């Protein structure tokens, strides 16, 4: 039986991690369950409530977003200022049977970078924190 933990705040998230008696799988939008290094665990820690832009300073090229923020939302916001993600995350939605390209956290967790990484760098080079 799968146990789903879905904290709604950073304090609740910290408590889930602190109280964990066994490993859990992290999940944002759940679009890349087979990519990266999947954890086999009956516990799922959902980050679905951690969405949206926290900080966006286009002049400084700074963006902070919740782990489950859809890539489409981030790309739309950046496009309004003629900006884009330098590492060009690939969209595996149709390959993985999803209707969404996924979330920022999923791209970072799976280490996904597209063809622009040659000039712009991989996603870890653009992520702090």
What are these regions (language model features)?
Residues 25-32:
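Glycine-rich beta-strand-to-loop/alpha-helix junction loops that act as flexible
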Residues 33-39:
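Short glycine-biased active-site loop of nucleotidyltransferases that positions the nucleotide triphosphate
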Residues 105:
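ATP-binding N-lobe of GHMP and related small-molecule kinases
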Residues 40-45:
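Short, well-ordered secondary-structure micro-motifs within conserved domains or adaptor modules
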Residues 1-24, 47-100, 108, 112-129:
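N-terminal glycine-rich flavin-associated loop
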């Amino acid at each position: 039986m799968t146990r789903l933990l879905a904290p709604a705040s950073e304090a609740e998230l910290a408590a889930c991690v602190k109280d964990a008696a066994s490993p859990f799988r992290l999940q944002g939008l759940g679009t890349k369950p087979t990519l990266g290094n999947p954890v086999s665990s009956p516990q799922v820690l959902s980050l679905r409530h951690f969405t949206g832009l926290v900080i966006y300073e286009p002049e400084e090229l700074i963006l902070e977003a919740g782990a489950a923020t859809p890539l489409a939302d981030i790309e739309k916001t950046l496009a309004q200022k003629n900006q884009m993600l330098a590492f060009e995350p690939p969209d595996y939605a149709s390959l993985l049977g999803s209707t969404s390209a996924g979330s920022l956290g999923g791209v970072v967790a799976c280490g996904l970078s597209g063809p622009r990484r040659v000039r712009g760098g991989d996603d870890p080079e653009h992520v702090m924190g």
